[in-house]
Amino acid sequence: MDYNSKTSTGGRNMAGARALWRATGMTDGDFGKPIIAIANSFTQFVPGHVHLKDLGQMVAREIEKAGGVAKEFNTIAVDDGIAMGHSGMLYSLPSRDLIADSVEYMVNAHCADALVCISNCDKITPGMLMAALRLNIPVVFISGGPMEAGKILASTVGKSHNNEDSSGGAIRKLDLVDAMMDAADDSISDEDVAAIEASACPTCGSCSGMFTANSMNCLTEALGLALPGNGSLLATHSLRRELFLEAGRTIVSLAKRRYEQDDDSVLPRSIATKAAFENAMTLDIAMGGSTNTILHLLAAANEAEVDFKMHDIDRLSRGVPCLAKVAPASQKYHMEDVHRAGGVFALLAELDRAGLLNTDLPTIHSATMKEAIDKWDIMNPDNLEARARYIAAPGGVRTTEAFSQSKEWSNLDVNRESGCIRSAQHAYSEDGGLAVLYGNIAERGCVVKTAGVDDSILVFTGRARIFESQDDAVAAVLDDQIVAGDVVIIRFEGPKGGPGMQEMLYPTTYLKSKGLGKECALLTDGRFSGGTSGLSIGHASPEAAEGGAIGLVQEGDTIHIDIPNRTINMQVSDEELAARREEMDSRGRDAWKPVSRDRHVSPALRAYAAMTTSADTGAVRDVSQVER
């Protein structure tokens, strides 16, 4: 079959277009080669992207060596950590759709044949994934890689707010969340807070724990759309250079197979099937990934026209054990430790041994996932290439440069009984790291990262404390108005109600800093940062702005949460709920809106709110809401 690009490069009538292509550097010999789009997300605003500036051209040169033509463009990238806790967070989730659209626009406008996605942080990988599945042309995902964990002498500053002693005897490992928690703890001096702040984020790369960015970059491996090591190999390590070069070679091979051999098995929709989405979700549950991944996998499946819904996630969550507890669930381990233990393919191998994966699926780099697992499982001592890749260690030097160090661990972590990654027989818990809860407060579901919930509060009953903005909830926590036994409810913060479905990292972090991390719960129709832990339940659907029952909860109502049985209910009769709904509906134009909230919402955000949907659908866009 013809290359897509022939539309703009072939025939007499395209002389004008070819003239413009020539002005970009193309020559006679380039017409007829596959044109590969490189979607780079370099920006100096985001540590996960600050090192990407020259990497697109590195991939481009490799594409050209392999017989393709490379054309790079950029997308935006929002740093959720910098946007957190103020009106900037309203823009984070909407940026996902903007990124997806921008990739679609550039690829389709210029008739590109294939796509390399250079992503990294929270909404960029999901946005590019949505675009890739929408476009359905050959694609390779290559992320910028994780940040090294921060490290500081444990005896000198701060204290651990985690579920276990994380000092390791001498060194306390840090990340962004530690800086936030300790800053809110009045018992820690300004000097100590400054020292922690200066140490928490030492290098370029996506934040160092199993937060949203790293979770999503791991899931692209499980979907079969990224190379082994993509989710865990540090941004600073020289071995990551080879992943970028391999991405360039791989995409040309995929493009030629698609167009010259008419092989549709290389297309993203042929790879990211329902079985592949189930594999990705199984991995997500086993590694205790961010709850945001649920939102993004649902949205990606929607773009792929795959029937993958919340009930599938609920079903999977009941049968997958927790095989990894990584920050924020445990400060003992960060992504550098996951990599040392074999990364994503170590987890996939353990899940395969437990009979929990479908491995008869293609990937961009192997005929089947089974073949890939057999090659990249470090538990096989004969897998020398895998063992060499996963020995990559942190450099321990502050830097914003990619590939700037080549340190190695003295040994791999192959301890599947008590190491970072466990076998199913030695799982952290039989119940996985994510769960979907249902009940009269969230009829279409809500989600919780169970890997971060202490066993003592898996079943919790408390009184509702109602807030209609994140800011008001934060103020109440910091003013000591929240006490043990409270269920903090933050509503009208969903995709429509916010708009933009803000992350609630500050409220949960401040609860922990006040010593209430095991004494309170938080429920919202908004969402949580991947850095959140504790009894933090988000994505309540339908959201309050769409008539969800979370909008009917009243101050002092009793809320019962039962994670083992997957339920969440307000202990209010059906009759009382019906009466409350009738009263709410009677408010006319003021119904299902915050009673009093002063928030500027720009036209761009109003447009997003007009078309978005609740979290149980992935907060995807539904243009029928505005079509006439």
From Swiss-Prot:
Active site: S529
HAMAP family assigned to the protein according to its UniProt record, in alphabetical order: IlvD
Annotated SUPFAM superfamilies: IlvD/EDD N-terminal domain-like, LeuD/IlvD-like
Membership in a protein family: Belongs to the IlvD/Edd family.
InterPro entries named in the record: Dihydro-acid_dehy_C, DihydroxyA_deHydtase, DiOHA_6PGluconate_deHydtase_CS, ILV_EDD_C, ILV_EDD_N, IlvD/EDD_N
Keyword Disulfide bond: no
An individual GO BP term: isoleucine biosynthetic process
UniProt KW keywords: 2Fe-2S, Amino-acid biosynthesis, Branched-chain amino acid biosynthesis, Iron, Iron-sulfur, Lyase, Magnesium, Metal-binding
CC cofactor note: Binds 1 [2Fe-2S] cluster per subunit. This cluster acts as a Lewis acid cofactor.
UniProt binding sites for Mg(2+): D80, D122, K123, E503
UniProt-annotated binding residues for [2Fe-2S] cluster: C121, C207
Catalysed reaction, written as an equation: (2R)-2,3-dihydroxy-3-methylbutanoate = 3-methyl-2-oxobutanoate + H2O; (2R,3R)-2,3-dihydroxy-3-methylpentanoate = (S)-3-methyl-2-oxopentanoate + H2O
Task performed by this protein: Functions in the biosynthesis of branched-chain amino acids. Catalyzes the dehydration of (2R,3R)-2,3-dihydroxy-3-methylpentanoate (2,3-dihydroxy-3-methylvalerate) into 2-oxo-3-methylpentanoate (2-oxo-3-methylvalerate) and of (2R)-2,3-dihydroxy-3-methylbutanoate (2,3-dihydroxyisovalerate) into 2-oxo-3-methylbutanoate (2-oxoisovalerate), the penultimate precursor to L-isoleucine and L-valine, respectively.
N6-carboxylysine carried by residues: K123
Quaternary structure annotation from Swiss-Prot or TrEMBL: Homodimer.
GO cellular component: cytosol
A Gene Ontology molecular function term of the record: dihydroxy-acid dehydratase activity
Lineage, highest ranks first: Bacteria, Pseudomonadati, Pseudomonadota, Gammaproteobacteria, Moraxellales
E.C. no: 4.2.1.9
Pathway participation: Amino-acid biosynthesis; L-isoleucine biosynthesis; L-isoleucine from 2-oxobutanoate: step 3/4; Amino-acid biosynthesis; L-valine biosynthesis; L-valine from pyruvate: step 3/4
Descriptive protein name: Dihydroxy-acid dehydratase
Broad class of enzyme this protein falls into: lyase
Cofactors demanded by this protein: [2Fe-2S] cluster; Mg(2+)
Source species of the chain: Psychrobacter arcticus (strain DSM 17307 / VKM B-2377 / 273-4)
